[in-house]
């Protein structure tokens, strides 16, 4: 059982208790801190849609520390990021691997960051199937289709040629923040919050 810290906020004569995630949400911060699955995707999408309804023009910050996970669940988050009108900045802390890196690159151009000791990893989608040969062939074709789709989206978001992304994702490809910046996955490596404020003021 995981413990969720509570935050007490005092306003005037009253006090209000928030779980830490609700308090962060109040500041338009969404945290992806686990494997990407259908449940996590639903929660992230719900938070993004809620924050857009509160203010469709104010920035939302998506902090990512994720090993990746389900492609379809990740694409649900990706499509929601693109669907809402509020700009979304992305920040990698710890690691953004696989679908985590894909979502890191999906932030608004100019607002994609990584902390200095974070790790980014990109690769092609993988899957294991058992059953009849015909069914295995069907699933293999779907994986190849998803591979091409993900690579084309990543090429678009990084500004790199499609063939470069295909080569970069052929195997597990671990990147430092500086290497991720060179590839176009992020725009800047942040050491402190002041770096982010300076970036936005420029």
UniProtKB/Swiss-Prot annotation:
Give yes or no: UniProt keyword Transferase: no
Q: Record's CDD domains?
A: S14_ClpP_2
Residues at the catalytic site:
98, 123
- Which GO terms fall under molecular function for this chain's record? ATP-dependent peptidase activity; ATPase binding; serine-type endopeptidase activity
Keyword annotations: Cytoplasm, Hydrolase, Protease, Serine protease
What superkingdom heads the lineage? Bacteria
The entry's localization annotation reads: Cytoplasm
Major enzyme class: hydrolase
Where does the protein principally reside?
cytoplasm
Q: What GO cellular component is one of the record's annotations? A: cytoplasm
A GO biological process held by the record = protein quality control for misfolded or incompletely synthesized proteins
Task of the protein: Cleaves peptides in various proteins in a process that requires ATP hydrolysis. Has a chymotrypsin-like activity. Plays a major role in the degradation of misfolded proteins.
**Could you say which protein family the record assigns here?**
Belongs to the peptidase S14 family.
Q: State what protein this is by name.
A: ATP-dependent Clp protease proteolytic subunit
Q: Record the organism.
A: Desulfovibrio desulfuricans (strain ATCC 27774 / DSM 6949 / MB)
């Amino acid at each position: 059982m995981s413990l969720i810290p509570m935050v007490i906020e005092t306003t005037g004569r009253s006090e209000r208790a928030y779980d830490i995630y609700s308090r962060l949400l109040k500041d338009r911060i969404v945290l992806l801190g686990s494997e990407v699955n259908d449940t996590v995707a639903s929660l992230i999408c719900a938070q993004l849609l809620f924050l857009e309804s509160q203010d469709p023009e104010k920035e939302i910050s998506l902090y990512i520390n994720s090993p990746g996970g389900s492609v379809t669940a990740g694409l649900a988050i990706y499509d929601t990021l693109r669907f809402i009108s509020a700009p979304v900045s992305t920040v990698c802390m710890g690691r953004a691997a696989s679908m985590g890196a894909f979502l890191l690159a999906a932030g608004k151009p100019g607002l994609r960051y990584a902390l200095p000791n974070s790790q980014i990893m990109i690769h092609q989608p993988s899957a294991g199937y058992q059953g009849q040969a015909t069914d295995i062939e069907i699933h293999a074709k779907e994986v190849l289709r998803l591979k091409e789709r993900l690579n084309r989206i990543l090429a678009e978001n990084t500004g790199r040629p499609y063939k470069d992304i295909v080569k970069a994702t052929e195997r597990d490809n671990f990147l430092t923040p500086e290497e991720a910046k060179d590839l176009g996955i992020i725009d800047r490596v942040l050491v402190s919050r002041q770096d982010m404020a300076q970036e936005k003021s420029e």
